[in-house]
Amino acid sequence: MSLLVLVALVPLLTAFIVMTGDRKEQERHARTGLLPIVASFLGSLATLIVVTSEGPITVQLYDPAAISNPAVPVGFYIDRLSAVMMVLITGVTTLIYRYSIGYMYQDRGYRRYLGMLALTTSVLLCMVTSANLAMLFLFWQMLSYLLFVLAHNHAHQPTLAGATNTFTLLRLSDAAFLGGIVLAYSLYGTLEFQPLFARAAESPVTLALWPSLGWEIDGVTAVTLLIFGGAMGKSAQFPIHTWLPRSLYAPTPVHALLHAGIINAGGFLLNRLAPLYGLSPATLHTVFVIGTLTAILGATMMLTQNDIKKTLGFSTIGQMGYMIMECGLGAFSLAVFHLIAHGLFKATVFLNCGNVIHKARQEPIFPRTDHDAEESELSTLTWSTGFLTTLLLPLVILLVTHGVLHIPLLESQGTLILLFFIWVTSSQAILSLTHLRAVASWKVSAAMLVTLMLVVFTYLFAVETFTHFLYPDPEEVASYFRAAALPRRLFDSLVVGTTLLTILGWFYLYARAHGRTIRIPGWVETFLQQLYVLFMNRLYLDQLYLKGGRLLLSVAHRLEKRLS
């Protein structure tokens, strides 16, 4: 079994082959270096099969009894979560490496890039198989540095500025992560995952923040909030998400790896510590708020960008917010399912970026005519079909999933919120009918609805199956949903309010499509225009952080002069 751990170290052979070979034969060495990457992928598949059939694998690299008071044992722990992440990492890396052999061939940093890509893969594999928080943090730090090196593959000023910004912001979030680890060890005396979870559950600790005012916080809440600070940085959560758009000057394959693998580290960290987060409803609520805010802001800023890479970057921020929100709802397995699907999709999109840009530059852009606008109007049939579907789709999903798929969707608030997002997404899909020439055809409407139903049910079935695979104990899954439950009045208000907004949106679209005048006060139009500019400029957070940094440097220089 210990041989399976070597899967994480095999990519180091690729780095050695590529970076130590003769420069004149770099393409041949690059192709040879693909073999260890493929071997690592095959080994990851074998590991997944072994872990699924025989259970988790624990490998200690030394005998703890032979060392006096070992604070941090060195070893690896591979369970189903680790094995799934290993397959995702090695699979995506295999495709990116093969693509990079030709794409990056004429780049001056060709060998350096391929070597760092292989080294990053090995570090990612070691991170997801770490046996304790200390080892996980060590590889987490190495990953941050390698991300800086990969983002700075091109030696020119914009790339350096983006890479430095990335390195700085990740250092701040990693400081919070380190604080959480130190606090966890001081409170519970261990950094091993299973003993840590057990001690946190059996021995609740309360910390006094301000004794004179009676301010207190649960120890597990303090630990999980600090560790979540590290996850916020890696997964580009608001307000420390600005490093991701600034790193867009890196090579396209680097973005494929970043958006498909590295940025998922936050979701993996929350899943690895799910039993710990399940003990703190306050932390889960905070995670939910941060994730929801990031998802909304990321999607909104994506719609205002005019650059394809920035659009994809903010799309990733929105998707990472959605993934973190799922963790905040207690749907940890769904977050893993989401990061896998998003990782595969975004890797494909980024690797196809160059081809899309090339075609866009060659194809003429025709102005939109009045005739086109008339054809895209919503017909009465299309609107009524979409509106009724918007109202009836949740009921149909509930009936079918309960009666046929036996998936309980009413037992927790988290699943209801996720159902609401499915509802909104389905409504958006129905709007695609407006882009069809046969927009008034009942056959087209029926085909769209049937396809939509099949997609929704397939998705729910796949998620339920994956949940049972990743967390076989139903009680554990239920405990996470109970811990993440919101106050009843707040939950009901959110559901009713968002439902009314969605329904009003349909009426607004119908009225505009039929030429009805909707009177909007002048101050509202001005506010919307200002809001558009605000989102287009990414909330001016880059400028705000830059001024804040200059202010801190100025204060530091003044203090230095006074003390010297």
Describe the residue ranges of each PLM region.
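...captures the hydrophobic TM-helix bundle architecture rather than a specific catalytic motif
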Residues: M1-P521, Q529-S564
